[in-house]
């Protein structure tokens, strides 16, 4: 088994980190740069910052927030939200991001994946998929989980890979913020359908939840927000517990 990654997520609106349950009832969690630095120091392998209202509000990414956060980091930094063109991606990279995440814009115009990948490399392109379970599998939602698309999550992940995505960030909308565990079945379905890394998101609450999504869900990385922001767990202790279960981790010194 390859080394698995623990990723801390910052959902940002109006320049502040927020966290809710199933994309609703958002609570303030703090300053993005401060939280990113804290999570990095505690052993997170990567930071993901998602400007969760940029698409819905029809604006670009909060570049100053990205810049201030990037200045505090020494680990890979992914930024998403409001990226609609290769030029938008370039501005986010210039602000300090190592990778960009695209979601709604890729659903509207899938060739955007190829455009950004050809310019910056597939390794820099993460396609984010927000999915909610239905009778036949899981449906992809756009615009921060507000708009159903009719697309099947597994089929869209396959297409994203074919178009040149370097990673998939899969969020279970049903599990998001619940701390009841990742959707291992959905994660395994997507992981088995593609060859690129899949990041599982939504539902982290205990170390065992991470172990389950790595072992049963076949995830390459697991992302969490509220358990890190509100002090339920930190990456260092989490990694130690996972390593004790023979799950390969990059352990902090």
UniProtKB/Swiss-Prot annotation:
Keyword Nucleotide-binding recorded: no
Primary localization class, coarse: cytoplasm
Keyword annotations: Amino-acid biosynthesis, Cytoplasm, Histidine biosynthesis, Lyase
Disulfide bonds: none
EC number: 4.3.2.10
Alphabetized Gene3D superfamilies for the sequence: Aldolase class I
Family the UniProt entry places it in: Belongs to the HisA/HisF family.
Oligomer and partners: Heterodimer of HisH and HisF.
Function as written in the Swiss-Prot or TrEMBL entry: IGPS catalyzes the conversion of PRFAR and glutamine to IGP, AICAR and glutamate. The HisF subunit catalyzes the cyclization activity that produces IGP and AICAR from PRFAR using the ammonia provided by the HisH subunit.
Protein name: Imidazole glycerol phosphate synthase subunit HisF
Organism classification: Bacteria, Pseudomonadati, Acidobacteriota, Terriglobia, Terriglobales
